[in-house]
A protein has these predicted regions:
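Short His-centered aromatic/hydrophobic patch
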Residues: 70, 89-96, 112-113
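A conserved mid-protein helix/loop that constitutes part of the nucleotide-sugar donor-binding site
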Residues: 14-22, 183, 190-209, 224-230, ...
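Short hydrophobic beta-strand element within catalytic cores of glycosyltransferases
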Residues: 283-287
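Nucleotide-activated donor-binding/catalytic signature segment of Leloir-type glycosyltransferases, i.e.
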Residues: 230-246
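Carbohydrate-associated surface elements
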Residues: 145, 164
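Aromatic "clamp/platform" in nucleotide-sugar-dependent glycosyltransferases that forms part
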Residues: 247, 266
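N-terminal strand-loop element at the rim of the active site
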Residues: 6-65, 147-151, 223-225
Length: 361
């Protein structure tokens, strides 16, 4: 029987990491000899006893560059498994895991988290992506639209496993919204170009300057765009309306206390935060970006959609929601009826079935 290696060089605290914990905690009782390779310090992450951790030995290692982490984890993969039969479940840095799998003669299952739009327009990038990913033994994607795009642009077959979500009931409130009775907005995601939070800030600036609406935005996440977003907030006198809150462990507690959830990404896979907002019964406005939001919101049936970057339309949708909350609230109530799509046990069992196809050979 092959060793099972979970490959994730950088654990940064987001949707990918949440799926990592769900998957590892579920499969640890289903298989023996499970290893997790990462270049991150794992003191704060709750993995089960059956998961054997492989990390850099240097206690001082604290490099934040994902490329460097991927190189180090590739070295650890070769060092520890070059003479063993193994199966790699790659949740990140798939180029590295596929390449190394050929060196050590291992099987490899890769999970794609975000749609590969950036490779489509460049011929060489597209060729490289298609060639390398065709070497994977199996490709897992997290939405049906993702599967269609992968086949359409790269002629690659894949298996859809929707994100598993644990729905918990919480009444916890956050101090930022305490005693504030007007429009409470929340957005969650890494502060990166992909998440495109500047669109939301521009929309809210437009809202502030053109309508007499009192609002507050709680923006959860960390990343390299922090300074850029903070400058925009201060330059437009939005500091009383918007708080950059950094990373928060239990994001669902914050969603629950808001009136409106907004996602502004340029591209996604299947964003957990939208599903968590649905579970909390909070109305949603999201970009119609490739590939997951449209599927989660069922083409606008379960929430409002707008084109990426269109902050004017976003402003209008927020204003419309403020003036008439009933329509979007009806969509959020309806959304709860479709949460079965993200069933925790059913979707995680799909990982077990997929792994079993390769683990014994």
């Amino acid at each position: 029987m092959r060793d099972l290696i979970i490959f994730i060089p950088s654990i940064e605290g987001g949707g990918v990491e949440k799926n990592l914990f769900y998957i590892t905690n579920y499969i640890q009782s289903k298989f023996k000899n499970i290893y997790l390779i990462t270049a991150d310090k794992l003191k704060k992450y709750p993995f089960g006893k059956n998961i054997k951790l492989i990390m850099p030995s240097a206690s001082s290692f604290n490099n934040q560059n994902r490329f460097i982490k991927s190189i180090i984890c590739s070295y650890l993969l070769i060092k520890n498994f070059k003479k063993k039969k193994s199966l790699i479940l790659s949740l990140q840095s798939n180029f590295f895991s596929i390449f190394i799998s050929k060196i050590i003669n291992a099987k490899v299952i890769i999970r794609l988290n975000t749609t590969p739009e950036k490779y489509i327009s460049n011929f060489y990038k597209k060729f490289f992506f298609k060639f390398l990913y065709s070497l994977a033994d199996e490709i897992i994607v997290n939405s049906n639209e993702f599967k269609k795009n992968l086949y359409k642009h790269f002629n690659l077959q894949s298996k859809v496993i929707l994100n598993p979500i644990k729905i918990k009931k919480t009444k916890k409130k956050i101090n930022f919204f305490k005693n504030f009775t007007h429009l409470k907005i929340i957005s969650i995601g890494r502060l990166t170009d992909q998440k495109n939070h500047i669109t939301l800030l521009k929309a809210l600036n437009l809202l502030k300057n053109n309508f007499s609406i009192k609002f507050k935005l709680y923006l959860i996440g960390k990343g390299y765009k922090y300074g850029f977003l903070l400058n925009y907030i201060f330059n437009n006198d939005l500091q009383k309306n918007i708080k950059l809150a950094g990373y928060k462990k239990n994001a669902s507690d914050y969603i629950k206390s808001s009136d409106l959830f907004v996602l502004t990404s340029n591209y996604e896979g299947l964003p957990n935060t939208l599903i968590e907002a649905q579970a909390a019964g909070v109305p949603i406005i999201s970009t119609n970006c490739p590939s997951g939001p449209k599927e989660i919101l069922m083409n606008g049936k379960l929430g409002d959609l707008f084109n990426p970057g269109d902050y004017i339309n976003l402003c209008k949708k927020i204003h419309n929601y403020y003036k008439n909350r009933k329509l979007l609230k009806k969509k959020s109530i309806l959304a709860k009826k479709y949460l079965y799509r993200f069933n925790y046990q059913k979707n995680l069992n799909e990982y077990v079935l997929t792994i079993r196809k390769y683990i014994k050979y």
